[in-house]
């Protein structure tokens, strides 16, 4: 015979166990180029728009004077949301390699702006958490859950 407290704890224990399995999934640390371009996600127009949104958000929130530009997509994957509200919607996750440019953040043509020349690489590594956005894009730019770009960690410093 189990106590009422044990019965209440069982659903929580089960949900923690199920969420723990999601953490066991690991992704290869190789770029899309090294994977032979087999990943079709990087060609998806919605993924490209999401990358552009993430890069723009990073530049807007960054305290740096100069803009960052995409160097390459290190890895990417599409996730299925467990949340009932977002079920069936597109959720992209990605690891991007960014590099600082000579252009200021709000100049018109950042896409064609050259990278800064320096002996020290200025790539950054950052964990940024965007709200789960579905394909219509209606939640893009709402700012909920976005990480602060000023907390970016210089990737190559201290090595």
From Swiss-Prot:
Signals that turn on the gene: Up-regulated by bacterial lipopolysaccharides (LPS), in some cancer cells such as promyelocytic leukemia cells (HL-60) or myelomonocytic leukemia cells (U-937).
Superkingdom, natural source: Eukaryota
Localization per Swiss-Prot or TrEMBL: Secreted
InterPro entries per record: CST9-like, Cystatin_sf
GO biological process entries: antimicrobial humoral response
Tissue specificity comment: Expressed in heart, placenta, lung, liver, skeletal muscle and pancreas. Not expressed in brain. Expressed in epididymis, kidney, testis, spinal cord, and thymus with a strong expression in epididymis and kidney and a weak expression in the spinal cord and thymus.
A molecular function (GO) term: cysteine-type endopeptidase inhibitor activity
Signal peptide: 1-28
A GO term from the CC aspect: extracellular space
Major localization listed first in the record, in broad terms: secreted
Keywords of the record: Antimicrobial, Protease inhibitor, Secreted, Signal, Thiol protease inhibitor
Function text: May be involved in testis development. May play a role in hematopoietic differentiation or inflammation. Has immunomodulatory and antimicrobial functions against Francisella tularensis, a Gram-negative bacteria.
Family membership noted in the UniProt record: Belongs to the cystatin family.
UniProt name for this protein: Cystatin-9
Record organism: Homo sapiens (Human)
């Amino acid at each position: 015979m189990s106590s009422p407290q044990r019965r209440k704890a069982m659903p929580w224990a089960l949900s923690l166990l199920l969420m723990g399995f999601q953490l066991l999934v690991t992704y290869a640390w190789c770029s899309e180029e090294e994977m032979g371009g087999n990943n079709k996600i990087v060609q998806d127009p919605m993924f490209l728009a999401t990358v552009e949104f993430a890069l723009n958000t990073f530049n807007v929130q960054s305290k740096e004077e100069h803009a960052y530009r995409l160097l390459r997509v290190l890895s990417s994957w599409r996730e299925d949301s467990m949340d009932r509200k977002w079920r069936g919607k597109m959720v992209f996750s990605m690891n991007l390699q960014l590099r600082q440019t000579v252009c200021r953040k709000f100049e018109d043509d950042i896409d064609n702006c050259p990278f800064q020349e320096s002996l020290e690489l200025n790539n950054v590594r950052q964990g940024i958490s965007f709200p789960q956005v579905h394909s219509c894009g209606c939640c893009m730019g709402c700012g909920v859950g976005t990480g602060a770009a000023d907390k970016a960690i210089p990737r190559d410093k201290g090595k």
